[in-house]
């Protein structure tokens, strides 16, 4: 399953704000965060490979602050779906149903009992520092999401109990930061991360509820899920290379940079692509052609701007390549 690159972008932004040299690390694999395409989608395995480079040796507890850089607006149609739900119960169940549209790598579950309801987050990689860092970031970001969506919906955020699946910080100042952020009822060393509410919250109506708008965004969410579905007919390696090359605008990483990002030797990458009847050069050109056709259909984007977005230093070089691919110049194609 693929997902929006926005989650990775928010993490990188948060790490940069925390003083981590992410831009220098991204450069090692041919990436520039400022050139990332916000509409790009990325496979979870590739996202992990990139994080392994940019978040190397990062202390997991920094996730408390970094996770607060996830932005509510980045949830797109899912945000509107939740805001137009009829009740808090409906909104929570929609969040579970469409959690593939969130920025979470872990799994969300809704656990209900007679007197309380818990939004539970289960991470798969708490046994390694990078996985623990990402989990701490996502748990922190989830609380921020819950608080902000309550505010946007015109609701008061209730008192909750927070359970965290890792030990308390040994540093007293850091422990205080956790207590300040998560509240008075904070418990460590729990099996899973859980945000526990009184069950009566489920029946609370959402002031911004709108049945017509809800159906509109329900359709949009379903369409996004389809867009993120992994193409099972394609090789995982080919998909990883394509996704990596498609991350940013204006520059396409070299084969050496791609191999480093995917954590495999360049020679091995070349050989494995050859075994699958393709090459880095072929995949790169296919991607540029696809992007060129998509951009050329938008009359608001000039030919010169398209050339720049595709990494050409001069529009003449782009014109020559386009004519070689499609038998006519970009301007002729537009007519």
Language model: regions and residue ranges:
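Short hinge/gating elements
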Residues: 76-82, 124-128, 203, 224
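Extended mid-to-C-terminal alpha-helical interaction segments
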Residues: 177-180, 184-335
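Amphipathic alpha-helix face/heptad-repeat signature
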Residues: 11, 84, 135-138, 258
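N-terminal low-complexity or simple alpha-helical regulatory segments
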Residues: 1-119
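Generic solvent-exposed, charged/amphipathic alpha-helical segments
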Residues: 12, 55, 96, 139-143, ...
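Short, well-ordered alpha-helical segments
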Residues: 89, 132-144, 211, 215, ...
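DNA-contacting interfaces and partner/effector-binding or oligomerization modules
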Residues: 107, 111-204
């Amino acid at each position: 399953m693929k997902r929006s690159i926005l989650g990775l972008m928010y993490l990188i932004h948060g790490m940069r704000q925390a003083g981590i040299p992410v831009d220098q690390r991204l450069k090692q694999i041919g990436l520039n965060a400022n050139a990332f395409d916000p509409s790009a989608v990325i496979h979870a395995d590739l996202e992990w490979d990139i994080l392994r480079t940019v978040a190397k040796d990062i202390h997991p507890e920094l996730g408390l602050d970094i996770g607060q850089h996830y932005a509510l607006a980045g949830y797109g149609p899912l945000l509107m779906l939740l805001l137009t739900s009829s009740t808090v119960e409906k909104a929570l169940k929609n969040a579970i149903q469409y959690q593939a549209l969130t920025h979470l790598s872990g799994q969300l579950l809704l656990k209900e009992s007679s007197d309380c309801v818990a939004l539970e987050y289960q991470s798969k990689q708490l046994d390694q520092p990078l996985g623990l860092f990402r989990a701490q970031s996502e748990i922190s970001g989830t609380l921020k999401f819950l608080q902000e969506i309550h505010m946007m919906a015109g609701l008061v955020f209730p008192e909750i109990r927070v359970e965290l699946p890792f030990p308390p910080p040994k540093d007293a100042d850091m422990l205080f930061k956790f207590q300040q952020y998560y509240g008075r009822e904070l418990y460590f060393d729990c099996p899973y991360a859980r945000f526990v509410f009184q069950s009566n919250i489920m029946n609370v109506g959402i002031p911004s509820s709108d049945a017509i708008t809800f159906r509109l965004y329900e359709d949009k969410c379903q369409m996004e899920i389809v867009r993120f579905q992994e193409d099972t007919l394609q090789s995982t390696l080919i998909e990883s290379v394509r996704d990596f090359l498609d991350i940013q605008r204006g520059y396409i990483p070299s084969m050496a940079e791609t191999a480093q990002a995917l954590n495999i030797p360049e020679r091995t990458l070349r050989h494995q692509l050859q075994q699958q009847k393709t090459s880095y050069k072929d995949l790169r050109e296919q991607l540029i052609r696809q992007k060129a056709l998509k951009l050329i259909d938008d009359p608001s984007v000039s030919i010169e701007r398209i050339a720049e977005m595709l990494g050409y230093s001069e529009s003449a070089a782009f014109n020559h390549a386009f004519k070689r691919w499609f038998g006519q110049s970009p301007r002729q194609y537009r007519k």
